[in-house]
């Protein structure tokens, strides 16, 4: 799915929004953070992912990583989710993502990707996005397509976020 790193996207997935579609996975995700810190989950996770305490880092990384793994497919893939629990993967995945998020993707402005889309306006391309992508809402692909009209927008009708879903694989390869 298309990710623009806009504030509303981060809030949708990591603060409130997707939580209403996956309350079971959400409950597991937020257990890593005390209730008094849940008003800003990305920052709360950042403090734990950069903690000096290895157990604290790992618990936060697993919660973060499993949250995304559990929401990436239209139909939850248990093997995919369990792969997100592996310590080495979880630590790398969560720390890299969170680092970019707390730093605004190192963009000059929030909507930099859309703002700079005219730079590739003359280049043909294909935008593939799962209709039921909860991680990166389809509005991102729609906005990019409007800003990049030479790109073909292919919405896979029975897919979520993962590039490993059959329809997404077919559209990408």
PLM regions with names:
Residues 1-46:
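A catalytic-pocket lid/entrance helix-loop region that shapes and gates access to the active site
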Residues 79-90, 117:
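Small-residue-rich helix-loop
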Residues 120-121, 127-129, 133:
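Short beta-strand/loop motif that positions the catalytic acidic residue
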Residues 135, 156-171:
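Catalytic histidine-centered segment of alpha/beta-hydrolase-like enzymes
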């Amino acid at each position: 799915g298309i990710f623009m790193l806009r504030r509303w996207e981060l809030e949708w997935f990591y603060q409130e929004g997707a939580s209403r579609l996956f309350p079971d996975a959400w409950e597991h995700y937020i257990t890593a953070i005390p209730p008094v810190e849940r008003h800003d989950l990305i920052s709360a996770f950042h403090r734990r992912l950069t903690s000096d305490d290895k157990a604290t880092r790992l618990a936060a990384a697993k919660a973060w990583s499993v949250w995304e793994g559990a929401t990436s497919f239209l139909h939850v893939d248990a093997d995919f989710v369990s792969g997100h629990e592996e310590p080495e993967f979880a630590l790398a995945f969560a720390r890299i993502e969170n680092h970019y998020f707390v730093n605004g993707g190192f963009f000059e402005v929030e909507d930099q990707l859309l703002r700079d889309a005219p730079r590739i306006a003359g280049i043909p391309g294909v935008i593939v996005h799962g209709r039921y992508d909860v991680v990166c809402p389809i509005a991102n692909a729609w906005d990019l397509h409007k800003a990049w009209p030479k790109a073909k927008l292919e919405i896979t009708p029975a897919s979520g976020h993962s590039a490993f879903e059959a329809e997404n694989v077919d559209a990408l390869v």
